[in-house]
Amino acid sequence: MAIMAMDMAQKTKLSAVFLIFCCANFTYAGDWQFDPSIIIDETYTDNVGLVASNEISSLVSQAGISIDSTYKAQQAVFNFSSQSTYALYSHDHKLDNDYHSVSSDLRLQLWPNGIILVATADIANRSRNFARNALADIVSADTVQVATYEGGIEYNVNNSDFIINSAISYRQTNSEDNIGDSEGMVAKINSNNGTSARHVFWELRHSYQELKNNGLNGKLSESEVKLGLITDYKVNPFLRYYNEGNSGSLGNPSRSIESNSYGLGIRWLISPRVFLDVSYNQPIGNKLDIDGNEQQEYVNAAIKWQPSSRTRLEANISERFYGNSYGFNFSHENRRLTNSIIYKEDVQTFTRNNFVTNIVGYYFCPNNTVSTIDECFVEDSAILSPDNPNNQGYQVFPIQELTLVEDNVFSLNKTLGWSSVLALPRTNISFNTNRHKRINLDSRIEDEYNATSLNISRKISGRSRVGLDISYTETSLQINTEFERTDRYRRYKVNYEKSLNSTLSFDLAVSYLNRSSDNLTFTYEEGRVSAKITKGF
């Protein structure tokens, strides 16, 4: 583990040096900002272990260095944000550890006609086991470091004849516990005709991923092409071709997770800023869907509406190898309010979202309902005998746990996200809600994740601000199986921020977390009080 951590730290340093070196050649023509700061954070928690009973309080002291840097020039944009923190735990110094996070991106124009070198680096501390604790952080000392690096080339052209947005890159993901690791090529291309088209219009959308890990590989490909004739009327005919394939050495080879079809449709130009595409599609060959049934003809429909540069709506309905498929993308922005709603369905692999049920032990528990695991511990003087009529009524009870394992399967992911921000003169209100449904295409087991949060921030003086955070998180794992479990997290937080001067600030926060679970051993409460000082330079 230590060797792995050193290796990841070394990669982080090399990536940062490489990005800084690339941008250094352009410093003479750009604007460079460098903002370092020192952070001291003291957090008291009354239940650091996040357990139902025998809670242990702890004072978690964090000291770290934060660096935020931005470089902007005509041909280059570079952003770098990093924080290194060392945490000490008063209840158990064996947990003392250092934590690192990095978020960096580089865009360097190599050629005036749209060739751009791109690179990103992201290092974050995520929950070690999402099923055990979805809200794990540094204070709970139950996180794992996950690093993702990506570098490649973009080619973008936007003129009156045609529009092309394309990219090809190499992506590598490494985690501290080796779960969810992958590396491989990622490519995409989107193209459509320009405004000067008079006879033919087209749309091209293609994405491709080829990932591998531990001798296994997965290829994910999806393509859609529309080619039509421009007429003097508001109705224009077009041909549509669609192809999707997910292959490799993953999952169950007997299941079909591909679809291929062609069709004929019309584009109705409802107005200059909105059009509707409708096509009737015929499957190619005798391919089967994921349930083993022959794929049938279907109708594909898509609508696009853009009344202004600040408002855009796209929606579609179609059919893929698993049945009906939907997509939705809406964004709107004005002086005060920003809204964004996105719904998408995609196939993934090599993630940190695959769980299996393991029995971690057997305990003697009362025959009646068990509220805590402590009730399963028999006193030293107690004697259990099934032949004794005075037996207290104990039984052998298995303790089960959902364990995070390698995601060597394809999964269908349906994600809905809604983000809304209201900016008033002295108050900012943000609302976010997300819903993620994951279907294991091998076992057909479903998991769901729902999260909703409300943040209100109010400026009470020139240097002071108060805030209120309310969040609700719900996870449902192994749905419709004997091991199904639902966890609900309710968190409330109040904070006060004070800027003492231009480089020194003080934050005080009080929070309360309540978790309820179908497995009572995971039900707990936690209260925190934290104070943080940030000194900039």
Which functions belong to the PLM regions below?
Residues 28-537:
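Gram-negative and organellar
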Residues 1-31, 537:
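Gram-negative bacterial Sec-dependent N-terminal signal peptides
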